[in-house]
UniProtKB/Swiss-Prot annotation:
Composition bias type Low complexity, residue spans: 77-88, 151-181, 388-400, 494-507
Keyword Coiled coil: yes
Protein name: KN motif and ankyrin repeat domain-containing protein 3
Keyword vocabulary terms for this entry: ANK repeat, Coiled coil, Phosphoprotein, Repeat
The gene coding this protein: KANK3
Gene3D superfamilies: Ankyrin repeat-containing domain
Keyword Cell inner membrane belongs to the record: no
Bias kind Polar residues: ranges: 1-10, 787-805
Organism (species): Homo sapiens
ANK repeat segments: 622-652, 656-690, 695-724, 728-758, 762-785
Residues modified to Phosphoserine: S152, S160, S164, S167, S168, S177, S271, S280, S293
Region (Disordered): 1-36, 58-184, 224-333, 385-547, 784-821
Amino acid sequence: MAKFALNQNLPDLGGPRLCPVPAAGGARSPSSPYSVETPYGFHLDLDFLKYIEELERGPAARRAPGPPTSRRPRAPRPGLAGARSPGAWTSSESLASDDGGAPGILSQGAPSGLLMQPLSPRAPVRNPRVEHTLRETSRRLELAQTHERAPSPGRGVPRSPRGSGRSSPAPNLAPASPGPAQLQLVREQMAAALRRLRELEDQARTLPELQEQVRALRAEKARLLAGRAQPEPDGEAETRPDKLAQLRRLTERLATSERGGRARASPRADSPDGLAAGRSEGALQVLDGEVGSLDGTPQTREVAAEAVPETREAGAQAVPETREAGVEAAPETVEADAWVTEALLGLPAAAERELELLRASLEHQRGVSELLRGRLRELEEAREAAEEAAAGARAQLREATTQTPWSCAEKAAQTESPAEAPSLTQESSPGSMDGDRAVAPAGILKSIMKKRDGTPGAQPSSGPKSLQFVGVLNGEYESSSSEDASDSDGDSENGGAEPPGSSSGSGDDSGGGSDSGTPGPPSGGDIRDPEPEAEAEPQQVAQGRCELSPRLREACVALQRQLSRPRGVASDGGAVRLVAQEWFRVSSQRRSQAEPVARMLEGVRRLGPELLAHVVNLADGNGNTALHYSVSHGNLAIASLLLDTGACEVNRQNRAGYSALMLAALTSVRQEEEDMAVVQRLFCMGDVNAKASQTGQTALMLAISHGRQDMVATLLACGADVNAQDADGATALMCASEYGRLDTVRLLLTQPGCDPAILDNEGTSALAIALEAEQDEVAALLHAHLSSGQPDTQSESPPGSQTATPGEGECGDNGENPQVQ
């Protein structure tokens, strides 16, 4: 007995179930055919499938000869229009068996309400339900062949009255074994049938659109017919043939596309697709006839004009989508670059600081240039006024007596004179003109001290000598030295190197009785009185009649108002710059004279003590005050005037960390008694043991390193600490031992409390430093002092050395300057 083999290469038919639940009583519906419905509405006969299986089995599975069996005609297939449900494609028919012995074997299946999935274009997958149905059918056929008798030649095998679809093949017929080419042909035919079904579905979807167009054209036709009676303009009659020709071409193109679609589809006349296509074709023919009948109407041309832009708009809308996608992809790369630059944020910080410094420098240069322009204008006006005043003065001097100038001066004291002198400070005395001309106009000098170590073993020079500076004027460096400096000096005067930051000391005055001291007389310099016989009296009159120029007075008044306001209130920078510029021009130049400074101080004192304290302690960009400059340039007469105000901050340090007291320890005096009196007064008013903010040196160490023996004695007399140490732990004795200052070493050893055994930060003593510097005499003196405990150094002291004794050269408790013996 031949077995029914299932071909696994058959495509999946897509049916979810083939055996629906039978009707009540186990009977099938008489209208159910022996077929399977595909998702596209195509019915496949199971007999055809069994025939394909028999062809695959070949001649080895041929049945025994017997009478052919007759087949009962199948029920007609329903049309394609009724094969689909409204919602989705479903299988409306299934297989059932008419065997009475097993009525419910094939009734176990899925519920009949499941929806069919559309056919997927991917590779076919085996359907277990179809395989189960085929195996069940094969088994029943084998059972039927074993139990049935051979039928007569003239009769056919009776079939089930229900038409269950079971049929037995003719046993006497031996079909020829098909080849692989025939099987491939069958598969291609089935695939072509499925493709045809898809095309029919696509054409069926276009039918509603065509019907909508037909309705729109009919409405347009009705509108055109309604407007035929209206008179047409003359312009439309000329363009009528062109619009009619355009409308005909559009109609022909639409009809051609529809006919081509019908030719490809070729639906049957009895199918719904065929009927709809026929209706569409008829509607188009009617439309062509109606359009032909309206050749003379202008409204037909408007239909053609409205139909063209629809297609163009569809194409224009598709273009921007691709461009927008490209635009959105561009910023991603830019953001990645911005993220990479975040790792380099450390580099722009230095560049930004440099830019800030450059901006500040530019602002400063602009301010200086503005001040210079204003000063130039003032000088030009003052020159013209001075020439006029000089001409008038010469005419008056020819006719007046010797008492006339002083009477004029007394009269000018009561009434302000409109004439202006070249300086911003004015005086009615005849000598004021010459004094102002002696002061050269210049900008604010910004200078710091340039440190240069002295040569070991060099002896201090006896000639006058001032410090060397590195000044910063208008953004450039310039070096300046005193005119009294001698080339034979081995020592170089220094201050401190310019630091990156600034530090200022506290204005700590030693007492409030500075006015009780006897200030040194101001040096007249180049200022000469034109009448020597009346020298004393005009000088006293000039001191009582000091006035400021109107412009400087206004600036001082504005500055006084700012000082009285709270700190949070905005200040006027122009007034501050003007006052500072004039103050440093008068008091801080190398050739500045004491008389103009005294006149300006008197004029500022009249406006208020608070303004006087502010002006006296004004500092430039390097932290230097007028006291720093006067001491550094050796203008101790000006320094005495500043100390007389009682508001001068003696201990204030500049940006290099040095105070005016430390600079005074390096200054050489010109007039021995007068200048030394000012220096001693400065030492007594300040803190002689104050240390520089950078190196920690004291004024005593600076004086020793520069060979100022007289300043060393004065500092010791004012209470300088001999054992004070700097930042490296060095003392004044170590400094003197290193430079070979033998006289200074003797002077230091005579001071009570001097400890030569002190060690610095490296554990080195003064004796070791002297031996290392090859200072044999100093080393022998230190060794003798350490060996004997208290050697007699008085007999070995040179005649020029000074020894401080109790009660001589010491400062008083009230801060008065000592008297030099």
